[in-house]
């Protein structure tokens, strides 16, 4: 299904930040365990490395760095959700409200960045490419970045991921997905929780831990996702000339890529 780009952009700008502000409390309560692959990356960095957590959510990686006594410089942290940032500050960390496509940091200064479960919320190929370029611009030559996104394929080597194992599902072959009308016009497929993805662009409902979450309309608790096909993240990275792919792995239903900023030659602007 091909969706209108204006509709997808509307979902990013007008809907997604409101959703995370609405569900911030129950979302934060459910996000406490860091991904092992992200922690391996952070632990591999030299002492004193300075980096950014882009789309920091409730700050769980800021907490993990502190709890593991990693000798990194204090991380820059940002997110689009004001209420999630309240949770970050409540944990004793500084963070700013910022969009991935308009980060408030100077370019070429950081040793690393992590961007976990953020890029898959950007609703067009161009916005996803621009997001990677935005992060790449922050790195100094030789700097590293980790980008993690949700995978469309929730089976790996014949086994279901924990996401699917947490629910019961039947074969989705031949299933016609329900479509949800969204403000601004148009419709987008509604993905049933804990079932295999049958489209790459979907709305996913939030199963609120706190049943008292108030919502003004049906869409207010639905998050837009673009789930990545095999090789899709690598293909995007290949379009950013200043980056080279170091590693790409599949971890429990996610694609995770580590990239390196190519050292610029003398007089070269290497941020594209």
Show which residues each predicted segment covers.
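Short catalytic micro-motifs in class I SAM-dependent methyltransferases
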Residues: 117-121
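Class I (Rossmann-like) S-adenosyl-L-methionine-dependent methyltransferase catalytic domain
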Residues: 1-105, 126, 133, 141-272
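Basic phosphate/pyrophosphate-binding loop/patch that engages nucleotide-derived ligands
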Residues: 137
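A conserved beta-strand element that flanks and buttresses the S-adenosyl-L-methionine
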Residues: 114
């Amino acid at each position: 299904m091909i969706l209108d780009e204006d509709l997808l952009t509307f979902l990013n700008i007008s809907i997604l930040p409101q959703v995370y502000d609405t569900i911030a409390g129950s979302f934060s309560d459910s996000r406490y365990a860091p991904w092992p692959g992200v922690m391996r990356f952070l632990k591999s960095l030299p002492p004193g490395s300075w980096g950014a957590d882009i789309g920091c959510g409730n700050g769980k990686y800021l907490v993990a760095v502190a709890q593991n006594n990693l000798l990194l410089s204090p991380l820059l942290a940002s997110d689009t959700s004001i209420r999630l940032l309240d949770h970050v500050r409540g944990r004793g960390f500084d963070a700013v409200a910022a969009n991935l496509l308009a980060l408030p940091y100077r370019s070429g200064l950081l040793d690393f960045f992590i961007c976990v479960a953020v890029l898959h919320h950007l609703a067009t190929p161009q916005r996803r490419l621009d997001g990677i370029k935005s992060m790449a611009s922050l790195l100094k030559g030789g700097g590293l970045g980790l980008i993690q996104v949700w995978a469309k394929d929730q089976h790996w080597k014949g086994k279901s991921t924990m996401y699917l194992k947490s629910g019961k599902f039947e074969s989705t072959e031949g299933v016609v997905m329900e479509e949800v009308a969204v403000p601004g016009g148009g419709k987008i497929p509604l993905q049933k929780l804990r079932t295999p993805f049958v489209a790459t662009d979907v709305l996913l409902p939030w199963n609120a831990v706190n049943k008292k979450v108030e919502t003004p309309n049906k869409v207010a608790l639905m998050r837009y996702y673009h789930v990545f096909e095999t090789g899709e993240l690598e293909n995007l990275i290949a379009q950013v000339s200043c980056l080279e792919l170091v590693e790409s792995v599949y971890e429990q239903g996610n694609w995770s890529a580590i990239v390196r900023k190519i050292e610029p030659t003398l007089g070269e602007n290497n941020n594209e």
